[in-house]
UniProtKB/Swiss-Prot annotation:
Function statement: Activates KDO (a required 8-carbon sugar) for incorporation into bacterial lipopolysaccharide in Gram-negative bacteria.
Principal subcellular localisation of the protein: cytoplasm
Similarity section: Belongs to the KdsB family.
Protein name: 3-deoxy-manno-octulosonate cytidylyltransferase
Single GO biological process annotation from the record: CMP-keto-3-deoxy-D-manno-octulosonic acid biosynthetic process
UniProt entry keywords in alphabetical sequence: Cytoplasm, Lipopolysaccharide biosynthesis, Nucleotidyltransferase, Transferase
Catalytic activity entry: 3-deoxy-alpha-D-manno-oct-2-ulosonate + CTP = CMP-3-deoxy-beta-D-manno-octulosonate + diphosphate
CDD domains: CMP-KDO-Synthetase (cd02517)
Gene: kdsB
Pfam entry (one): CTP_transf_3
Group of enzyme by EC: transferase
Amino acid sequence: MSFVAIIPARFASTRLPGKPLVDIHGKPMVVHVMERALESGAERVIVATDHIDVAHAVEAAGGEVCMTRADHQSGTERLAEVIDHYQFPDDKVIVNVQGDEPMIPPVIIQQVAKNIAQRSVGMATLAVPVDSVEEAFNPNAVKVVRDAQGNALYFSRATIPWDRERFAVSQDSIGDNFLRHIGIYGYRAGFIRRYVRWEASPLEQIELLEQLRVLWYGEKIHVDVAQAIPSAGVDTAEDLQRVRAAMR
């Protein structure tokens, strides 16, 4: 099975300016992500960026870069520009690898690529079990509920599903029904082209979760349990210090 991994690497970040280029043991973070993607077996790994310094860093490490506009509202919109630039056919499998996850396990990149290749759904993604009360109630940890076929019913920053009987007694423990979404996506190039033509949905704008646009327009998202649990990504200076320590 062949697939292309695309890494959106936006330079501007409110909480961590110049995030793709922050140093982790002598390499820019985006280069670490690129190396993990190459280890996944992708036939091609492309870093999509709006900043020339990011492009130079990737090229210096032997990577492939596609320069994109700076006004994209989401990583998926940036991907759409890349697939049109390269004129990928509609059936080409594309995996969107987040540019701020330098410790992403290569096996889950391959997993999501296989899942979209084997299913007739619009999008494939992954989740991991929630194992703490703090995570279940943390709005920064996106939860997902699935149907019997493993397709997403809804993604939310809220605590879903709400365990009515358990939580009526206490919110000090959780059951086994919670899944945290991991922000990695697999699609076919043609689906990305359709996605960016859709208007943003009300639910997407309320939750600030772009995958809700897919459900709003009646498409399916398959959610598999990840074969390996990735470390959290880098959003803040504190996250960066944690990742540096973990990667020693």
